[in-house]
């Protein structure tokens, strides 16, 4: 399959630069996987689409202020984007500079350049940086970091983004991008879902900056997926198996929840799904056999991205591309701060190719 098979025309005006004033008031395009039928509504329609006993699986990662500005002690300006926190003193990061720093390079970080750090090693495209500061890394990032808004949100980050670019249930710091399908859930909607008898479980996948990297090969089978840390604890496994046993659906909130659950299913030795604590490089594209997910809540993704490929593998290629064409025609808002989709599984998708 070619990357260009997953391209579509998107007017610049449909890229959302700010979220809706009320999280759950975004539009919702529902796609019935088996038939391709589309219906238009608002996000709170989920209450009518979910049945008592259905299981929603959320990603409880929390976005860290992962973008740092500063300069090398020798003078050149740099921009640092944290990929992951290694421990209380060290990070793994992308560094943008006119000339890549060498190991041993001193860095002065923060708007006032008050934080001293050293680039200690290079690992491929990533740089290992150690802070010369008594505070833990997370405290330093909270003090001097900027929220790492995606590159297509073409504006500087604002103070409000520290909350707007977080899910209301975010708990475990470590992501450099929000699991954006979850941004639409507010406390009243969560309460109403619980009231209806909808079950909830939480995985953790710390979204890395690699999520924004374009696919740089022509043939998607040649693409090497970036690595991200995921946790699928025993209580999530129990909730999934219980939902399946009683004939209810497992509904992933976002592609990161999909990738966490499917990674845990792939690694399982004795059951449908087993606990997972570790890195995943799972790449889901048409032809993939889904093992766990029955329905998916997700935002609208970039053309030619691994995420639109994941959706195509779930709903079927033709149904997905038709839904995106309709979304553009109906002026849905796209990407991280945009509108959402509710998609049910298409069992025929596995045999469909572009």
UniProtKB/Swiss-Prot annotation:
Function: Transfers and isomerizes the ribose moiety from AdoMet to the 7-aminomethyl group of 7-deazaguanine (preQ1-tRNA) to give epoxyqueuosine (oQ-tRNA).
InterPro entries the record matches: QueA (IPR003699), QueA_dom1 (IPR042118), QueA_dom2 (IPR042119), QueA_sf (IPR036100)
Principal place of residence: cytoplasm
The keyword Ion transport appears for this protein: no
Chemical reaction(s) catalysed: 7-aminomethyl-7-carbaguanosine(34) in tRNA + S-adenosyl-L-methionine = epoxyqueuosine(34) in tRNA + adenine + L-methionine + 2 H(+)
Subunit: Monomer.
Cell compartment(s), UniProt: Cytoplasm
Top-level taxonomic group: Bacteria
Protein name as catalogued: S-adenosylmethionine:tRNA ribosyltransferase-isomerase
Any single GO CC term annotated in Swiss-Prot or TrEMBL for this entry: cytoplasm
Gene name per UniProt: queA
Family assignment from sequence similarity: Belongs to the QueA family.
Organism: Salmonella gallinarum (strain 287/91 / NCTC 13346)
Pathway: tRNA modification; tRNA-queuosine biosynthesis
One GO biological process term: queuosine biosynthetic process
Keyword Ion transport (UniProt): no
Keywords: Cytoplasm, Queuosine biosynthesis, S-adenosyl-L-methionine, Transferase
EC number annotated for this UniProt entry: 2.4.99.17
GO MF annotations in UniProt: S-adenosylmethionine:tRNA ribosyltransferase-isomerase activity
């Amino acid at each position: 399959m070619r990357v260009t098979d997953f391209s579509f025309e998107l007017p610049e005006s449909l890229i959302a630069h700010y979220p809706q004033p009320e999280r759950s008031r975004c539009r919702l395009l529902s796609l019935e996987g088996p038939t391709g039928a589309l219906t238009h509504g608002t996000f709170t329609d989920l209450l009518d689409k979910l049945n008592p006993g259905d299981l929603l699986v959320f990603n409880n990662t929390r976005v860290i202020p992962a973008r740092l500005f500063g300069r090398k002690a020798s003078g050149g300006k740099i921009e640092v984007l944290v990929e992951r926190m290694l421990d209380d003193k060290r990070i793994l990061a992308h560094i943008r500079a006119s000339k890549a720093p060498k190991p041993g390079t001193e860095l002065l970080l923060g708007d006032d350049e008050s934080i001293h750090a050293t680039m200690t090693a290079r690992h491929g495209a990533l740089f290992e940086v150690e802070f010369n500061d008594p505070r833990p890394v997370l405290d330093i990032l909270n003090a001097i970091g900027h929220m790492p808004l995606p590159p297509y949100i073409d504006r500087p980050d604002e103070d409000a983004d520290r909350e707007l670019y977080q899910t209301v249930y975010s708990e475990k710091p470590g992501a450099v991008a929000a699991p954006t399908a979850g941004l639409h859930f507010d406390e009243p909607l969560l309460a109403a879902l619980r009231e209806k008898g909808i079950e909830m479980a939480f995985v953790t996948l710390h979204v890395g900056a690699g999520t924004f990297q374009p696919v740089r090969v022509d043939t998607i089978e040649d693409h090497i997926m970036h690595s991200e840390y995921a946790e699928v604890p025993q209580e999530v496994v129990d909730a999934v198996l219980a939902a399946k046993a009683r004939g209810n659906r497992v509904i992933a909130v976002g592609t990161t929840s999909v990738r966490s659950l499917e990674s845990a299913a792939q690694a399982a030795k004795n059951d449908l799904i087993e606990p997972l604590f570790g890195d995943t490089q799972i790449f889901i594209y048409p032809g993939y056999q889904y093992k766990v997910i029955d329905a998916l809540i997700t935002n609208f993704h970039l053309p030619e991205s691994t995420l639109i490929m994941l959706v195509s593998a779930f709903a079927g290629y033709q149904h997905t591309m038709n839904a995106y064409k309709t979304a553009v025609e109906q002026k849905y808002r796209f990407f991280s701060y945009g509108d959402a989709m509710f998609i049910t599984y298409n069992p025929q998708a596995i045999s469909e190719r572009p």
